[in-house]
Amino acid sequence: MSSTRWLHRQLNDPYVSLAKKQGYRSRATFKLIEMDSKFSIFKKGQYVLDLGSSPGGWSQFAAQRVSHNNNNPVFAVDIQNMDAIPNVIFIQCDIINDIELLSDKFHNKKFDVILSDMAPKACGNKQVDHANIINLCEISLDIVVRFTRENGVFITKILQGEYEKEFYQSMKTYFQSVKYFKPKASRKDSSEMYLVGLGFKKDSQDIKTIES
């Protein structure tokens, strides 16, 4: 997309204006707000992990929803830097290569909600872009299995394509229910959707250990 077309789209996007008005760092925040309204994701006192967090819109909203007496209830992880957010601990690392670093930073903590709005840089080839985001989804699911509490929730971005159903079935192994959701805040011309895993099965951690 040319810079002129991008600027025109941004200026005419109601969610961009709304994000600025409400103090959120990105329009993507409203996708999470919709999913929380639909599935009742967040509760006070929960711990949340936000993968691919920069610039921080999802972490902002999650911290607002769960902050109670638990200081720093949200852990945010991204390969890029992210400006500080109240009640959010930011870890700058590459989740593909630094999972043991994450384990050290989490101090054996388990999360009630794990979020992933990650997407690789688009190359313009839909099949390649789809395969790349599925790879990120699989890496995120590995983290979910390792660090999620029983009955926890996992939300991940996905692009429709060849491997979509296979990944959906993988999620069903670990969650009592898996739902597709396309927020109104998603652009109409985008193939992005979200998978929402509800009710993480504690026993599924044993399945993953055996497979490994």
From Swiss-Prot:
GO terms for molecular function: rRNA (uridine-2'-O-)-methyltransferase activity. S-adenosyl-L-methionine binds at G56, W58, D78, D94, D117. Keywords: Cytoplasm, Methyltransferase, rRNA processing, S-adenosyl-L-methionine, Transferase. The keyword Iron does not apply. The active site is at K157 (proton acceptor). It catalyses: uridine(2552) in 23S rRNA + S-adenosyl-L-methionine = 2'-O-methyluridine(2552) in 23S rRNA + S-adenosyl-L-homocysteine + H(+). It is found in: Cytoplasm. Belongs to the class I-like SAM-binding methyltransferase superfamily. RNA methyltransferase RlmE family. Specifically methylates the uridine in position 2552 of 23S rRNA at the 2'-O position of the ribose in the fully assembled 50S ribosomal subunit. HAMAP family: RNA_methyltr_E. This is Ribosomal RNA large subunit methyltransferase E. The lineage of its organism: Bacteria, Pseudomonadati, Pseudomonadota, Alphaproteobacteria, Rickettsiales.
